[in-house]
Amino acid sequence: MAVPPSAPQPRASFHLRRHTPCPQCSWGMEEKAAASASCREPPGPPRAAAVAYFGISVDPDDILPGALRLIQELRPHWKPEQVRTKRFTDGITNKLVACYVEEDMQDCVLVRVYGERTELLVDRENEVRNFQLLRAHSCAPKLYCTFQNGLCYEYMQGVALEPEHIREPRLFRLIALEMAKIHTIHANGSLPKPILWHKMHNYFTLVKNEINPSLSADVPKVEVLERELAWLKEHLSQLESPVVFCHNDLLCKNIIYDSIKGHVRFIDYEYAGYNYQAFDIGNHFNEFAGVNEVDYCLYPARETQLQWLHYYLQAQKGMAVTPREVQRLYVQVNKFALASHFFWALWALIQNQYSTIDFDFLRYAVIRFNQYFKVKPQASALEMPK
């Protein structure tokens, strides 16, 4: 769950310090263009080019020297004394620094260093494949290289969104259109399997075998978690939600809004892969509550959801949709939102054990588990339209 930067302010070369993100856009500005409603992609992704690899390891506790070595490889024409840097501190999976020369940041390299033991949570080779796949469909920035413990990629112009922004109809329409576009990326004609159950089972196994003895009393017992995981798989697998290519981690700051071009793009593809359509949407709806100060009173109301889902389905189908189709997806999404709570709660328990990032992962896990049990009766009672 790394979160992206907004544009850094110019600053002295070769120094890192904490900054407050600087907004890059005017929220009163109307979009110049809306994403096309016809978002279908042709079967089979274009062939991706090979990605450069450098045998450099960047010290996560002292990122700058390693980042500058990478910049010498990627931008040899940049004079070292002119390189400006900014470290971003919002991420809760990885560490991120931007390197650039010009104030307008038209050419800016982001250096991302993987978090401690995140290989337990993320398939890094798969992440690179996803990055290339999305780039081939014009849904991702350029991937410049990988290195021993991270990767470098293009800075995407725009502003990272906050919870208050994704509730704005003009913006959530753009988000729905972009998600519909990504969901139409095909798997080379093969029948993809959802990654949800495999990943959740792996996370649960880690919690059970490596973390269980030290679990807080505020966390449900392992036996309860095992029972709930089985219940989720049994009930959600029956909903017939289509398996599509999903982002799977669409929190606010993974959405970049470009007010000049009038579109949004998604970043951070660590958890991307083929999964249930309704999981990706339900997970995004959960993120309306935020991450640092979680408030589930901000979970989108039924009418907001129906409008969002209408935009999504219309973009996906390229034609008018019926109220029944929207209602069907509404039920699926709110049931799969339960799986989202469970997934990220398990994830947070693992991060709490291994991560060196300054974030209260245990508190976050407890919040997600509590919300899971709170909304489970209501979500379970939802019925598919006849």
Swiss-Prot record:
Tissue: Expressed in kidney, liver, ovary, testis and prostate.
One of the record's GO cellular component terms: cytosol
Keyword NAD in record: no
Pfam families xref list: Choline_kinase (PF01633)
Enzyme Commission code: 2.7.1.82
Pathway: Phospholipid metabolism; phosphatidylethanolamine biosynthesis; phosphatidylethanolamine from ethanolamine: step 1/3
InterPro entries: Kinase-like_dom_sf (IPR011009)
Keywords: ATP-binding, Kinase, Lipid biosynthesis, Lipid metabolism, Nucleotide-binding, Phospholipid biosynthesis, Phospholipid metabolism, Transferase
One of the protein's GO biological processes: multicellular organism growth
Entry keyword annotation includes Metal-binding: no
Gene Ontology molecular function: any one: ethanolamine kinase activity
SUPFAM superfamilies per UniProt: Protein kinase-like (PK-like)
Catalytic activity: ethanolamine + ATP = phosphoethanolamine + ADP + H(+)
Family label: Belongs to the choline/ethanolamine kinase family.
Primary role: Highly specific for ethanolamine phosphorylation. Does not have choline kinase activity.
Protein's name according to its UniProt entry: Ethanolamine kinase 2
UniProt organism field: Homo sapiens
